[in-house]
């Protein structure tokens, strides 16, 4: 059976034989897992690499992702693909029964186009029935670290792709809140209900980005609620400035604020991204990667990402206007040589840290990053 773009299918039995030969002789076949990160972490076919194709990558790429985008940390694999050293590449998602059923905007389709653009000769196949069927038929060829069986069907973008550990604790509730900046933390409703965690981190205020999460300790901490639902109709951007001002007010009082929603994945992450973009004058992509290094499961819904991109254009337009109005900006416009000014838009991101690191274990090695755009 051949798909419109010529993608052929591979049955699980054929892949089982192929995986067995690969493990015995070394890799001429590449397995690419096109499912979300958390699904891959919960279980995957042995030897498979998880492609990176999250919301921000899709928006930036506009349907034309590159190998560098989908396999950013796999330089050797990219080089082997381009050199034609793989005889076969097998793609799989969760349960696609056949190639014709793939949507044009699916992750598999995006990855397929990237491979065909950038790689030398290779036989590209789709695993019929996806991981779900293969894992049920050949569990001995799968690596499973967590179980997804207890997850109910998602009711909103906030609940998509959530995994559970083997002890039953949702991934978004494991560990503690993560430090975004010394005064700004991101976490879930579970973290907001743990007074021991809050006190250990020195939290003095909470920003509750939901309409249904309770404020458990109103006599002990300062609270502010932003009643936003996690759906594609919600206008979260109308709350950006109010949220930013609240975070700044806590900072000015030498306090620390925890921004949370239900899972700490979509709504609260969106607020933290908006804060970084506004106060540090960085693009969404830079802010997203920074926050994701600290809380790897963030995933604002598609509408929120669109609102953040619009906010980015407003923030960077303001940056341009400020620079153009400054004395140094005027001199540049006149074509006169000037010394490089000390930009108000230069700031230092901390280096990458673990997702659940505590403040005492965060070594802040600063390297100034000039983030002001060319106006």
UniProtKB/Swiss-Prot annotation:
<protein>
    <recommendedName>
        <fullName>Dual specificity protein phosphatase 4</fullName>
        <ecNumber>3.1.3.16</ecNumber>
        <ecNumber>3.1.3.48</ecNumber>
    </recommendedName>
</protein>
<comment type="function">
    <text>Regulates mitogenic signal transduction by dephosphorylating both Thr and Tyr residues on MAP kinases ERK1 and ERK2.</text>
</comment>
<dbReference type="GO" id="GO:0001706">
    <property type="term" value="P:endoderm formation"/>
</dbReference>
<dbReference type="InterPro" id="IPR000387">
    <property type="entry name" value="Tyr_Pase_dom"/>
</dbReference>
<dbReference type="GO" id="GO:0004721">
    <property type="term" value="F:phosphoprotein phosphatase activity"/>
</dbReference>
<dbReference type="InterPro" id="IPR029021">
    <property type="entry name" value="Prot-tyrosine_phosphatase-like"/>
</dbReference>
<dbReference type="Pfam" id="PF00581">
    <property type="entry name" value="Rhodanese"/>
</dbReference>
<feature type="domain" description="Tyrosine-protein phosphatase">
    <location>
        <begin position="176"/>
        <end position="317"/>
    </location>
</feature>
<comment type="similarity">
    <text>Belongs to the protein-tyrosine phosphatase family. Non-receptor class dual specificity subfamily.</text>
</comment>
<dbReference type="InterPro" id="IPR016130">
    <property type="entry name" value="Tyr_Pase_AS"/>
</dbReference>
<dbReference type="InterPro" id="IPR001763">
    <property type="entry name" value="Rhodanese-like_dom"/>
</dbReference>
<keyword id="KW-0904">Protein phosphatase</keyword>
<dbReference type="GO" id="GO:0007165">
    <property type="term" value="P:signal transduction"/>
</dbReference>
<dbReference type="GO" id="GO:0070373">
    <property type="term" value="P:negative regulation of ERK1 and ERK2 cascade"/>
</dbReference>
<dbReference type="GO" id="GO:0016791">
    <property type="term" value="F:phosphatase activity"/>
</dbReference>
<feature type="domain" description="Rhodanese">
    <location>
        <begin position="25"/>
        <end position="143"/>
    </location>
</feature>
<dbReference type="GO" id="GO:0005737">
    <property type="term" value="C:cytoplasm"/>
</dbReference>
<dbReference type="GO" id="GO:0005634">
    <property type="term" value="C:nucleus"/>
</dbReference>
<dbReference type="InterPro" id="IPR036873">
    <property type="entry name" value="Rhodanese-like_dom_sf"/>
</dbReference>
<keyword id="KW-0539">Nucleus</keyword>
<dbReference type="InterPro" id="IPR003595">
    <property type="entry name" value="Tyr_Pase_cat"/>
</dbReference>
<dbReference type="GO" id="GO:0016311">
    <property type="term" value="P:dephosphorylation"/>
</dbReference>
<dbReference type="Pfam" id="PF00782">
    <property type="entry name" value="DSPc"/>
</dbReference>
<dbReference type="GO" id="GO:0043409">
    <property type="term" value="P:negative regulation of MAPK cascade"/>
</dbReference>
<dbReference type="InterPro" id="IPR000340">
    <property type="entry name" value="Dual-sp_phosphatase_cat-dom"/>
</dbReference>
<dbReference type="InterPro" id="IPR020422">
    <property type="entry name" value="TYR_PHOSPHATASE_DUAL_dom"/>
</dbReference>
<keyword id="KW-0378">Hydrolase</keyword>
<dbReference type="InterPro" id="IPR008343">
    <property type="entry name" value="MKP"/>
</dbReference>
<feature type="active site" description="Phosphocysteine intermediate">
    <location>
        <position position="261"/>
    </location>
</feature>
<dbReference type="GO" id="GO:1990439">
    <property type="term" value="F:MAP kinase serine/threonine phosphatase activity"/>
</dbReference>
<dbReference type="GO" id="GO:0008330">
    <property type="term" value="F:protein tyrosine/threonine phosphatase activity"/>
</dbReference>
<dbReference type="GO" id="GO:0004725">
    <property type="term" value="F:protein tyrosine phosphatase activity"/>
</dbReference>
<dbReference type="GO" id="GO:0017017">
    <property type="term" value="F:MAP kinase tyrosine/serine/threonine phosphatase activity"/>
</dbReference>
